[in-house]
A protein has these predicted regions:
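Positively charged n-region of N-terminal signal peptides that target proteins for export
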Residues: 1-4
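Short glycine-rich His-centered loop
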Residues: 25-68
Length: 258
């Protein structure tokens, strides 16, 4: 009798666990994961940036874009899903990851550089931090500006080069936001500026540095010409970015929590 009672209790317990597992929770019961973005023009939208109009925006003011509503942006589509919610948007049109953009070297605190503006950024309290940049580094700098791989003892002169700047950025985020998962998004069009994407050197550097820090690198598929206007994602391109990022986040977060 006692044995049957114990078995019955165990079965009820197992059933309760299975019913409350992430796979079986209703949309209203699921944990909402907050995400913060550090990005360039691809992630801007007027009035939605963390510091309002203090950040330069590309969307929707560009005369050539059809992204005329915030609902068309990749990150708003992600915000509209049941699992994720936008925490902070730190995106500045024309910004680079390194301190250098062509012949210009940014000073500490300048928001036009991901690295120099990190200490000034309000990241909120995110569960996820996504880095989506490198495009302006590719468009304005050369392979000579890649620099060497370096993972500690960073100097300000190091941060004028892409590799140490990108490593510093991830290192900073890991140290200052230990409870957040960090993801990097590698732009499409790897191999050349004419495609509106990254040079091979920058794309490969991102992959290597993400591997070093055990950061998930979401590599976007090539966005065809129909998905870009003036080298920037249009509505079609935004859908492609959203679908890839959404799929990668769900897959990676489920795998990591098992």
């Amino acid at each position: 009798m006692i044995r049957r009672l114990i078995i019955a209790i165990c079965l009820v317990f197992m059933y309760t666990i299975s019913c409350t597992s992430p796979q079986n929770l209703s949309k209203t019961d699921k944990q909402i994961l907050k995400f913060t973005i550090i990005g360039d023009s691809y992630s801007t939208y007027d009035g939605w940036n963390n510091k309002g109009n203090d950040f330069a925006t590309y969307y929707p003011t560009s005369s050539v874009t059809d992204v005329s509503d915030v609902a068309y942006t990749w990150w708003y589509k992600l915000h509209y899903t049941p699992e994720f919610q936008l925490e902070k948007l730190n995106a500045y049109s024309g910004s680079t990851i390194s301190y250098k953009k062509g012949s210009t070297v940014f000073k500490e605190g300048d928001k036009r550089s991901f690295c120099s503006g990190l200490s000034q950024s309000d990241m909120g309290n995110p569960d996820i931090i996504m880095i989506f940049g490198g495009t302006n580094d590719a468009w304005n700098n050369t392979d000579a500006d890649l620099g060497y791989y370096k993972y500690d003892d960073f100097t300000q002169s190091d941060l004028e080069y892409f590799r140490p700047a990108f490593a510093y950025m991830i290192d900073y985020l890991i140290r200052n936001y230990p409870d957040a998962r960090i993801f990097n998004i590698t732009n499409s069009g790897r191999g050349g500026k004419p495609e509106g994407g990254l040079t091979q050197g920058i794309a490969d550097s991102m992959e290597e540095i993400c591997r070093h820090y055990n950061v998930t690198n979401i590599i976007l598929p090539s966005i065809l010409d129909s998905g870009k206007t003036n080298r920037h994602p249009n509505k079609e391109g935004m859908v492609i970015i959203f679908e890839q990022v959404y799929s990668a986040l769900k897959k990676d977060l489920v795998v990591k929590t098992i």
